[in-house]
């Protein structure tokens, strides 16, 4: 019986030691964010709340979907790198190729397929991202 317990403990230890878990370091960024407003740096503003545009953030993936947008429903996937004050999106294609046409992603707050945002505000309820041309305001949903 003692040998069986030792064998079981050894197998369990080896099994658990072989597992690596990648944990998300995104902090408040993780979750579903509803795009509430898109402001141009020049002063224009568009209320996007009724279009139900959502950015879903998990681990290193960002998915953009729209549920009431009049032209298209999104379904765009991007990888992202986040630092304390910036967010850089890049295509989710394994080979790094462009998966989408810029004209299709532009209505969802992107001006480039490799977009770089400055994080103006990020907490558990609100997020404000600013690119060279746009300011995106989100609420956590």
Please provide the spans of the model-predicted regions.
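Sec-dependent signal peptide recognition
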Residues: 2-9
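C-terminal motif of bacterial Sec signal peptides marking the signal peptidase cleavage site
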Residues: 15-18
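Bacterial lipoprotein signal-peptidase II cleavage site
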Residues: 20-27
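Tryptophan-anchored aromatic micro-motifs
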Residues: 27-44
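Exposed, flexible binding/inhibitory loops of compact, secreted disulfide-stabilized domains
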Residues: 30-32, 49, 56-57
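Beta-strand residues in well-ordered beta-sheet regions across diverse protein folds
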Residues: 36, 65, 90-91, 129-130, ...
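Contiguous, well-ordered beta-strand patches that form the walls/edges
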Residues: 39-46, 60-122
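Edge beta-strand at a domain terminus
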Residues: 79-86, 122-141
């Amino acid at each position: 019986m003692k040998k069986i317990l030792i064998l079981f403990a050894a197998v369990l230890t080896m099994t658990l030691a072989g597992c690596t878990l990648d944990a998300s370091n995104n902090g408040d960024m993780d979750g579903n964010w509803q795009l509430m407003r898109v402001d141009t740096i020049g002063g224009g503003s568009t209320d996007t709340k009724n279009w139900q545009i959502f950015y879903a953030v998990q681990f290193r993936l960002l998915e953009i979907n729209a549920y009431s947008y009049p032209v298209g429903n999104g379904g765009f996937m991007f990888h992202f790198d986040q630092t304390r004050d910036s967010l850089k999106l890049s295509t989710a294609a394994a080979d790094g190729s462009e998966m989408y046409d810029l004209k299709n992603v532009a209505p969802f707050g992107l001006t480039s397929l490799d977009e770089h945002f400055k994080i103006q505000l990020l907490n558990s309820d609100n997020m404000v991202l600013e690119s060279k041309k746009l300011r995106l305001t989100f609420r956590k949903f």
